[in-house]
UniProtKB/Swiss-Prot annotation:
One of its GO terms (cellular component) is plasma membrane. NCBIfam families: PRK15432.1. PANTHER family: ABC TRANSPORTER PERMEASE PROTEIN YPHD-RELATED-RELATED (PTHR32196), AUTOINDUCER 2 IMPORT SYSTEM PERMEASE PROTEIN LSRC (PTHR32196:SF29). It is a multi-pass membrane protein. Residues 334-360 are annotated as: Disordered. The lineage of its organism: Bacteria, Pseudomonadati, Pseudomonadota, Gammaproteobacteria, Enterobacterales. It is found in: Cell inner membrane. InterPro entries: ABC_transp_permease. Residues 342-352 have a biased composition (Low complexity). It comes from Yersinia enterocolitica serotype O:8 / biotype 1B (strain NCTC 13174 / 8081). The complex is composed of two ATP-binding proteins (LsrA), two transmembrane proteins (LsrC and LsrD) and a solute-binding protein (LsrB). The chain crosses the membrane at residues 18-38, 45-65, 76-96, 99-119, 121-141, 161-181, 219-239, 255-275, 290-310. This is Autoinducer 2 import system permease protein LsrC. Keywords: Cell inner membrane, Cell membrane, Membrane, Transmembrane, Transmembrane helix, Transport.
Length: 360
């Protein structure tokens, strides 16, 4: 049992390494099936396909670290994609149109944070409501129609330049490094972990937990806006169901990478690797020529499997730790020694009486 506990604790403390090993193992497996699969071009192609999910995983990580969850990111992604598309078709420049989308995403995330922190609405309930709100607003703006005829400037953002990586791909890599340093190396970043691990304790330490949570939701909205811009630049048009179902994949990517649903545990790198692994699984389905509707099924199955596996092992480890902790307080009953005879049950001899007792 001790070896089992140590093995699980090693896996739990090295979820990034576990996800990386899974990615490499999948590459090796597919390399055996198709030798052309194992090359740098395949790696960059999967990274390009994973950019939207990576951005959503970064935002979801910040929210989940504070022990919250946001299921409206798919709708925010669609709303921001519509915003940038409508602004471009209205004659605004690319930079200004992207700024509009980022402000819309930040505003949507900020509103989610207000609902959770100030109005004390549970995050899952609040964001379920805004999921429908933002989706409905998106359809109202477009009239249920697709946005087409986007300028070439937007599409150039996803055109490969250096090492087969697009400008927005390089921007995402810089963003990954910056967010990893922010959360892992700064006092402000550690405030997210403290807020999710022990809310009352963080408040007693002087951390402004409400501001931290609002900031997390706002940054989640910004990441969703960037994902919407990437989506529009990659395919060149905006369908009326843009972003639908992305929230589940974002949460699954974070859980695969070691982000705890209970808050306070995980890293950005782990979430990125989880997003890459999910996208790699999608590419495997394409290679195996399976229908596209298998993607959501596989993503849901992987998420459910990880949650069940993680929960069962966590309970087993906690039970074993409790047994070891309280084992030293358990005293074993001492068996009576049959060879030692007690003198308490012997009848008093005549020699034991005093003179006074004899006189009486």
């Amino acid at each position: 049992m001790l070896k089992f506990t140590q093995s699980y604790q090693f896996i739990q403390n090295n979820r990034e390494g576990t996800a990386l090993l899974a990615i490499l193992a999948l590459f090796a497996l597919l390399g055996v099936i198709d030798r052309n699969y194992f090359n740098l071009q395949t790696f960059t192609m999967i990274f390009s396909s994973a950019q939207i999910l990576i951005l959503l995983a970064i935002g979801a990580t910040m929210v989940m670290l504070t022990r919250n969850i946001d299921v409206s990111v798919g709708s925010i992604t669609g709303l921001c994609a519509v915003t940038v598309g409508m602004a471009l078709n209205a004659g605004f420049g690319l930079a200004l149109s992207c700024l509009f989308a980022l402000l819309v995403g930040m505003g949507a995330g900020f509103f989610n944070g207000i609902l959770v922190t100030w109005l004390r609405i549970p995050a899952i309930v609040a964001t379920l409501g805004t999921l429908g709100l933002y989706r409905g607003l998106m359809l109202l703006l477009t009239g249920g129609k697709w946005i087409e005829g986007l300028p070439a400037d937007l599409k150039s953002l996803s055109t490969p330049i250096l090492f087969s990586i697009s400008p927005i791909g390089w921007l995402i890599m810089l963003l990954i490094v910056a967010m990893a340093l922010l959360l892992g190396k700064t006092a402000f970043g550690r405030s997210f972990y403290a807020t999710g691990d022990n809310l009352q304790g963080a408040r007693q330490l002087g951390i402004r937990t409400d501001s931290i949570r609002i900031f997390a939701f706002s940054m989640n909205g910004v990441m969703a806006a960037l994902a919407g811009i990437v989506f529009a630049s990659q395919i060149g048009f905006i369908p009326n169901q843009t972003g639908s179902g992305l929230e589940m994949k974002a949460i699954a990517a974070c859980v695969l990478g070691g982000i705890s649903l209970l808050g306070g545990t995980g890293t950005i790198i782990g979430a990125i690797l989880g997003a890459y692994l999910l996208t790699q699984i999608d590419s495997v389905l394409v290679l195996l020529r399976l229908p596209a509707w298998w993607n959501d099924f596989i993503a849901g199955l992987v998420l459910l499997g990880v949650l069940v596996f993680d929960g069962r092992l966590r309970c087993a480890v906690e039970r074993n730790i409790r047994q070891q902790k309280y084992a030293r307080f358990t005293t074993r009953p001492v068996a009576p020694d049959k060879k030692v005879k007690s003198n308490n049950n012997k009848a008093p001899s005549s020699k034991s009486f005093t003179k006074k007792e004899v006189v009486r």
